[in-house]
């Protein structure tokens, strides 16, 4: 009798004690909000738009070394990547900022999708986009080895892992766009291609080609 009473008292305990300003798991699952929010987080770091993130992840490094931009701020003239003496804050920023944000959001999408479906495929492509830039900056990266998630993988291993991930993504997307060339998914959350899956397919293949040329 006591056991039955205790069970009934604790039934729905977590929901009953949920703060009123916090969404429930059921509410977060509506309209793909859970996966969509993590999808946006991955986009924001694979293709940074926010001014500070863009400056530190793209502009001060690749855009200058690629001769797209030059340093106009006198404060940047003494120490920068072109002089090979960039401040430590510049050097470590992408690793400390983009890497954890991309990988944490990807893990959540991986969990929510059970490693299947279009959203998972798009997440694999975004992960490849982000990690390709990072491994070209730093070389070896911790990409989640099964034996030791904190172990650093060689750049060769990173490239091969990303290509395998992109193959998985294109295997998911290709049958969909063969059936319907204008197929879309996650339109409301897709800031890159507005859900157009054929463009995601092209991006995946472009990333594979970029790595193949470098290998």
Name each model-derived stretch.
Residues 1-8:
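Sec-dependent bacterial lipoprotein signal peptides
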Residues 8-69:
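Membrane-proximal, proline-rich intrinsically disordered regions
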Residues 72-215:
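Structured, solvent-exposed acidic/aromatic patches
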């Amino acid at each position: 009798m006591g056991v039955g009473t205790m069970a009934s008292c604790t039934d729905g305990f977590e929901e009953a004690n949920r703060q009123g300003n916090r969404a429930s798991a059921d509410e977060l699952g509506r309209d793909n909000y859970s996966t969509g929010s993590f999808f946006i987080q991955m986009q924001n770091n694979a293709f940074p738009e926010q001014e500070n993130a863009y400056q530190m992840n793209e502009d001060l490094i690749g855009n200058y070394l690629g001769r797209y931009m030059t340093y106009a701020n006198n404060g940047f003239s003494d120490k920068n990547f072109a002089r090979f003496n960039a401040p430590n804050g510049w050097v470590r920023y992408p690793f400390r900022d983009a890497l954890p944000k991309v990988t944490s959001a990807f893990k959540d999408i991986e969990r929510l999708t059970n490693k299947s479906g279009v959203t998972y495929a798009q997440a694999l492509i975004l992960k490849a986009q982000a990690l390709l830039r990072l491994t070209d900056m730093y070389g070896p990266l911790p990409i989640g080895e099964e034996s030791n998630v904190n172990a650093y993988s060689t750049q060769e291993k990173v490239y091969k892992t990303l290509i395998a991930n992109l193959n998985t993504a294109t295997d998911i997307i290709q049958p969909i766009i063969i059936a319907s060339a204008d197929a879309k998914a996650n339109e409301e959350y897709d800031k890159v291609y507005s859900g157009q899956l054929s463009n995601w397919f092209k991006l995946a293949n472009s990333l594979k080609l970029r790595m193949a040329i470098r290998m």
